From Swiss-Prot:
Annotated ranges, domain ABC transporter: 8-246
A Pfam family: FtsX
Positions bound to ATP: G44, Q45, S46, G47, S48, G49, K50, S51
Species in which this protein is naturally found: Acinetobacter baylyi (strain ATCC 33305 / BD413 / ADP1)
InterPro entries membership: AAA+_ATPase, ABC3_permease_C, ABC_transporter-like_ATP-bd, ABC_transporter-like_CS, MacB-like_ATP-bd, MacB_PCD, Macrolide_Exporter_MacB, P-loop_NTPase
Gene name in the database record: macB
Name used for this protein in its record: Macrolide export ATP-binding/permease protein MacB
Alphabetized UniProt keyword annotations: Antibiotic resistance, ATP-binding, Cell inner membrane, Cell membrane, Membrane, Nucleotide-binding, Translocase, Transmembrane, Transmembrane helix, Transport
GO molecular function: ATP binding; ATP hydrolysis activity; transmembrane transporter activity
Length: 664
């Protein structure tokens, strides 16, 4: 006769629990050996310690002292993940209250242990369906636990226990919540499993249930008081032809495992699906949790877009002053009331001297005067700008019709004039062509030779009337002066504008014998405005980030509540073999998913607000979104999920399996 092999070995096992300042001893020097293929019943009344013993046998708990070995492996000093591995590979649990996951179907519940064992999804599904079919639930695979009777739920629990092979079946009061008929069916299934080679341990207070076992162990007050063989009434059935037994009685082989990487992906997929299921089950709470993230992300993205839009518009207005331009003024600065301000030393020859410098592309002296324009019976006040032929290129003005005056016109003091479209609308309301028409500028007649688009001012659109004539004509025929108001210099792109600015100041100071001029560099203004708007955007964004932090705290609070609500689910997952990292991963993914979806909705809200702002502002200012800010929003929402989701996830991962299972 073949010698039985010891499967579970307990020696001098003691389990104590703290009770105030002292401890209470629940199990007292337990010595027990369970062999492969046994059908054992552990019998005892409430408080006898039988459930504590079952928890230790199933690696859900640890002994305070003593030794417990599974297939010769000492468990007392194993890490939590090592105990989880033993639960996956050796044990299948059948609970009195079934402990099925309410958000999963019957098939989904049965598949859970195989997820953590690294079995392929296809094989998981095939095996779960086969087990449920063999247990008479082939038509109920998609039903939720709430749609099943107590007996059907217990059979799902049995199928789950067998999913990873179930070498040892631990049944805690398996008939306690069932009617008599369902209880008989469950015991029959357990007997068949034992006949097929499974080691079955039944924990019960009912001696009638215990009599189904071939070995009965009685426990009282934490001690084993009896350990005897038993001949059950169904013993004669064990000698029947095994081929006559249902397929469920044949010991199932473990599923094929996959690579560690594929197993990790499967567990991630499972965690992702469970996160979606949990979010869908509490839609309103999930939305309210997301709301802080939505508002925070929308605020940050919108503020950055407003800053970018404002900066872009201001820089476009600066560009209307001319790109790479330096304007030379008389005096020492705006508002200069010194004698230098009254000197009339800035003259056209200064412009000629500047035009010969290698860093200069174009130069235009400028004078101006306000005069009344008359054409037929119409008259209006306009600004007469005396400029050179290069002025239009320097300022980037676009011709709508006609052409500019040339260098000969400047030399010969011609009375040619270029008008802007505002002037055209004022005087040529009938749609006639202004080109070639003569208008009276003050008392000076001038022939229109071109039409330009109006120059945009720094405050937006400008409706003022502007006309342009050769500066020599304006100086001699209108103002009677020899000096110019300012000189606009366009710098060669290959030269630094700051270096060119210093060179201009030095040159004119040398020509005038003193520094009686100052400059305005368009690039310096651009850089100053860019820096200022960036700083303001950063400051306002920092304020908006506060709402993101508040949203993150909201996510953490709700996830802590979720962990509390789902404590029993966590216990079930640990019982079927989930590692601490699996639990941490599941709740962390849920937090990240909440924040990511909140980030997507926040960006969409921001885009909607941008459209509204652009429509309401009607060109006064605009929002300009950047890919960088949107990507940063998603990264930020993900980090919030990780940071604020870690504490709840860590709390979930560190739960004690026994305490989690006992939580209602």
């Amino acid at each position: 006769m073949m010698t039985k092999q010891a499967l579970l070995e307990v020696h001098n096992l003691v389990r104590e629990f703290p009770a105030g300042d002292s401890t209470v001893q629940i199990l007292k020097n337990i010595n027990l050996t369970i062999y492969e293929g046994e059908l054992v019943a552990i019998v005892g009344q409430s408080g006898s310690g039988k459930s504590t013993l079952m928890n230790i046998l199933g690696c859900l708990d640890r002994p305070t002292s003593g030794s417990y070995k599974v297939s010769g492996q000492e468990t007392g000093k194993l890490e939590p993940d090592d105990l989880a591995k033993l639960r996956r590979e050796y044990f299948g649990f059948i609970f009195q209250r079934y402990h099925l996951l309410g958000d999963l179907s019957a098939e989904g519940n049965v598949e859970v242990p195989a997820v953590y064992a690294g079995v392929t999804p296809a094989e998981r599904k095939q095996r779960a369906t086969a087990l449920l079919t063999e247990l008479g639930l082939g038509s109920k695979t998609e039903n939720r636990p709430s749609q099943l009777s107590g007996g059907q739920q217990q059979r799902v629990s049995i199928a789950r226990a067998l999913m990873n092979g179930g070498d040892v079946i631990l049944a805690d009061e398996p008939t306690g919540a069932l009617d008599s008929h369902s209880g008989v069916e469950v015991m029959r299934i357990l007997r068949e499993l034992n006949a097929a080679g499974h080691t079955v341990i039944i924990v019960t207070h009912d001696m009638q249930v215990a009599k189904n076992a071939t070995r009965i162990i009685e426990i009282s007050d934490g001690k084993i008081i009896a350990d005897r063989e038993n001949i059950p009434e169904y013993a004669s059935e064990l000698n029947k032809d095994p081929d006559a037994a249902p397929a469920i009685a044949n010991k199932q082989s473990k599923g094929k495992s996959v690579s560690a990487f594929r197993s990790m992906l499967d567990r991630l997929s499972e965690a992702f699906q469970m996160a979606l299921i949990s979010m869908n089950a509490h839609r309103m709470r999930t939305f309210l949790t997301m709301l802080g993230i939505i508002i925070g992300i929308a605020s940050v993205v919108t503020v950055v877009a407003l800053g970018n839009g404002s900066q872009k518009q201001i820089l476009e207005n600066i560009s209307s002053l001319g790109t790479n331009t330096i304007t030379v003024f008389q005096g020492r600065g705006f508002g200069d009331n010194s004698k230098t301000a009254n000197f009339k030393t800035l003259v056209p020859s200064d412009a000629d001297a500047l035009s010969s410098q290698p860093y200069v592309t174009a130069v235009s002296p400028m004078v101006s005067s306000s005069k009344t324009i008359r054409y037929k019976e119409n008259e209006a006040t306009a600004t007469i700008n005396g400029v050179s032929n290069d002025y239009f290129d320097v300022k980037g003005l676009t011709f709508k019709d006609g052409q500019s005056f040339d260098q000969r016109s400047v030399r010969d003091l011609t009375q040619d004039v270029v008008i802007d479209t505002n002037t055209q609308k004022q005087f040529f309301t009938d749609g006639s062509n202004p080109i070639g028409q003569v208008v009276l500028l003050g008392s000076v007649p001038a022939r229109i030779i071109g039409i330009v688009e109006p120059q945009t001012s720094s405050m937006g659109s400008d409706d003022s009337l502007n006309v342009y004539m050769p500066y020599t004509t304006v100086m001699s025929r209108m103002l009677g002066q020899s000096n110019v108001r300012n000189i606009i210099v366009r710098i060669n792109d290959q030269y630094s504008t700051s270096a060119a600015e210093n060179a201009i100041v030095n040159l004119l100071t040398l020509r005038h014998g003193q520094q009686d001029i100052f400059t305005m560099n368009s690039d310096s203004i651009r850089q100053t405005i860019e820096k200022t708007t960036s700083t303001m955007t950063l400051l306002v964004s920092a304020i908006a980030v506060i709402s993101l932090i508040v949203g993150g705290i909201g996510v953490m609070n709700i996830m802590l509540v979720s962990v509390t609500e789902r404590t029993q689910e966590i216990g079930v997952r640990m019982a079927v073999g989930a590692r601490q990292s699996d639990i941490l991963q599941q709740f962390l993914i849920e937090a990240i998913l909440v924040c990511l979806i909140g980030g997507v909705l926040g960006v969409l809200l921001s885009l909607g607000l941008g459209q509204l702002i652009n429509k309401v502002a009607a060109g006064n200012f605009a929002v300009a979104y950047s890919t960088t800010s949107i990507v940063a929003a998603f990264v930020c929402s993900t980090l919030i999920g990780v940071v604020f989701g870690f504490l709840p996830a860590r709390n979930a991962a560190q739960l004690d399996p026994v305490a989690a299972l006992s939580r209602e």
